[in-house]
Design a protein with these regions (language model features):
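Short beta-strand-to-loop acidic/aromatic patch adjacent to the donor-nucleotide binding site
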Residues: 62-73
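Short beta-strand/loop segment that forms part of the nucleotide-sugar
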Residues: 10-18, 39-43, 68
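Glycine-rich, basic loop-to-helix element that forms the pyrophosphate-binding segment
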Residues: 43-59
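Short, acidic, metal-binding catalytic loop of nucleotide-sugar glycosyltransferases
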Residues: 1-9
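A conserved acidic beta->alpha catalytic loop
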Residues: 1, 16-25, 46
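Conserved donor NDP-sugar-binding/catalytic core segment of glycosyltransferases
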Residues: 77-109
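Catalytic core of nucleotide-sugar-dependent glycosyltransferases
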Residues: 161, 173-179, 187-214
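Conserved nucleotide-sugar donor-binding catalytic segment
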Residues: 108-189
Length: 260
């Protein structure tokens, strides 16, 4: 789908996160064809967030967009739409477009959030739309993911919650997935158990910056659970200490779900 883009003004950056299936030879063949610009980077497997950090460090364009998995594709006019919006809004922090599943499901309306920040939308609403993001590279470099030894997952929301600059929000589709599942939801308790430190960092951060009291309270309780799970010893806030009993119950629930 990248070769078929109507606007070829982009670079396809491939981050090979430890594959052993001949990916290098395949990519070198694509580069030799010279149909679109491609850069290729390799690293040891460390989780998607570490591959994203490497991509940000090596991005040679003013804006970085749209992260694609191997089973995703972009509509033929996606790059043209993105570049048109960037030309019409010079200096903008970024664009939030839609990512949809190729199953006919009607996508969400996100244009109503136009010129609001990621933090504003995520901390105020029960936002669940899948998105394709275009973000200014220099801005992205402020929000790289922490790397925790022994853990290979860090929720993308950790960086989005910290982005307080206004974004352009559009209902244009930037990414489509041909294989859609709720695998992340199904395996969420395994992720919790395997990555407690990263989830603790995320929920603690969210509890500190979220204004919405309901969301703040949920994050405090979640942070308490991951505090226990990850063996943290740092001093806790008065609010976190107050809700530790509920955090303990949530911790027990997570461990129970992880065993079933």
């Amino acid at each position: 789908s990248l070769i078929d883009q109507t606007d070829k003004d982009f670079i396809w950056m491939i981050v090979d996160d430890g594959s052993d299936d001949g990916t290098r030879d395949t990519v070198q063949g694509w580069i030799a064809e010279n149909r679109i610009r491609i850069t290729y980077h390799t690293k040891e497997n460390g989780g998607k967030h570490t591959a994203y950090n490497l991509a940000v460090d090596n991005c040679a364009t003013d804006y970085m967009f749209v992260a694609l998995d191997s089973d995703d594709f972009m509509p033929r006019d996606a790059v043209s739409e993105i570049n048109g919006l960037l030309r019409s809004n010079p200096g903008c922090c970024g664009i939030v477009g839609l990512a949809v599943c190729d199953n006919g499901r009607k996508p969400d309306d996100i244009e109503k959030f136009n010129m609001r920040s990621m933090y504003d939308v995520l901390s105020t609403y029960d936002f669940s739309a899948e998105t394709g993001l275009v973000i200014r590279t220099e801005y992205l470099k402020k929000f790289k993911y922490p790397v925790i030894e022994g853990e290979k997952f860090f929720t993308e929301a950790y960086t989005y919650y910290q982005m307080t600059e206004p974004f352009i929000w559009t209902n244009k589709v930037f990414r489509t997935s041909t294989y859609c599942s709720d695998g992340l939801t199904k395996n969420i308790y395994r992720l919790y158990a395997a990555n407690p430190k990263s989830f603790y960092m995320y929920q603690k951060m969210r509890s500190e910056i979220t204004v919405n009291f309901k969301k703040k309270l949920k994050s405090v309780i979640s942070a308490d659970a991951f505090y226990i799970m990850s063996g943290q010893s740092e001093k806790k806030s008065a609010l976190a200490r107050l809700f530790m009993p509920l955090g303990f119950l949530y911790y027990k629930y997570i461990m129970h779900k992880n065993r079933t």
